Amino acid sequence: MDGVSFSVAPGEIVGVIGPNGSGKTTLFNSILGQIKPTSGRMRFMGEDITGMSPLALSRRGVGRTFQTLQVFGSLSLRDNLIVAAQEFVRGMPSRLFAAPDAGLGAQADAMIALFGLERVAHLPAGSLSYGQQKLADIAMAFMPRPRLVLLDEPCAGVNPGLVDGLRELLLHLNKTQGGSFVVIEHNMDFIMRLCPRVICMVEGKVLAEGAPEAVRSNPAVLEAYLGN
């Protein structure tokens, strides 16, 4: 990445688009401490988080999803949600070894109902379809009620007929939990309908930033992202 600089306001939803290799995932991994930047700084709620570990970020209220699903196949979907919330307080080992916290059961049940996963809530997550695991993975990111959520390709693997429903879910969570979202997504229509502000990256740089229609109609974006 080179010269990438932007801010996200409390409660704001920002979309990041761009062709493969544009630096979107590198951006996420840098924020999450998976990659240490060679220069530049990142700040969250006034604190310098450059190079901070994923656990430390989680405890400061940063949630995330990755392209690789984070569900534990041997645990029920419901228990996956509960231990995801425990990570915020106790750290990553709790996701593997801690007994489920009964006090989080009601919160998990509410999230399961919101995502329409009641029928599979008590099944091992590994037995669910990819789309169901994807929804569970997204739900897990919201269990600790984070202040900032980084969503990497939330539409990937989701039935096209459910994409609009996923958008409504994210808007609902944004309204009810009040956190900020940064969303990476190849589905431009999804981003344009979800995010009031869109950033287009190309070759590690910000090519365009602004309102959805302004970015969509930018000739440089059309050439770089759509190949026209």
Predicted features, each with a name:
Residues 149-153:
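Catalytic Walker B motif of ABC-type/P-loop ATPase nucleotide-binding domains
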Residues 32:
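Helix-to-loop junction immediately C-terminal to a conserved catalytic motif
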Residues 40-47, 60:
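Conserved ABC transporter NBD signature motif
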Residues 145:
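Conserved catalytic motifs of ABC-family nucleotide-binding domains
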Residues 50-51, 111-129:
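Conserved ABC nucleotide-binding domain
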Residues 17-19:
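The feature captures the beta-strand-to-loop junction immediately N-terminal to the Walker
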Residues 89, 94-120, 161, 168-171:
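Conserved ABC ATPase "signature" region
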